[in-house]
Amino acid sequence: MPSMDIVSEVNEVELRNAVDNSVRELKGRFDFRGKEASIEYKDHVVTLTAEDDFQCRQLVDILRMQMSKRDVDPKSMDVDDKAVHSGKTFSLKVKFKEGIETLVAKKLVKLIKDSKLKVQVSIQGDSVRVTGKKRDDLQQVMALARESELGQPFQFNNFRD
């Protein structure tokens, strides 16, 4: 019986490349010339620092654009609501969603079961295992998961026939 796992992970290498490209773009941008702004990546958290709140939001947009170019889904970003003001700079922390939370996993299982596909779905820690009789059923589940608006990107691995 074919089976697969639905997971939510961020490719660490591509994320680092996106941050490096963002830093390169930041150095070349005219609106940031002469301003104190930086993008730093450490321990799976990106810290954006700028002289005002508007510039922090622009840094988020730069990072989002570079992540899209590197095929890292921007939906995995978890940006702070408010910029922290310290001294003469504002800073934002951007964390990345890893693993499928229990609540999101339950919604995904319900979505798959409501679709009336002939598959078995089970939650296994931070991933969801889908087993079916036909490979086509699993491909329909993949399409369903991609179309779902659960606020988190999904990847599919461990595909077995």
Swiss-Prot record:
Transmembrane segments: none annotated. CDD domains: YajQ_like. It holds the Pfam family DUF520. GO terms for cellular component: cytosol. It comes from the Bacteria. GO terms for molecular function: nucleotide binding. Keywords: Nucleotide-binding. InterPro entries: DUF520, UPF0234-like_C, UPF0234_N, YajQ-like_sf. The keyword Nucleotide-binding applies. Nucleotide-binding protein. HAMAP family: YajQ (MF_00632). Belongs to the YajQ family. This is Nucleotide-binding protein Spea_3114.
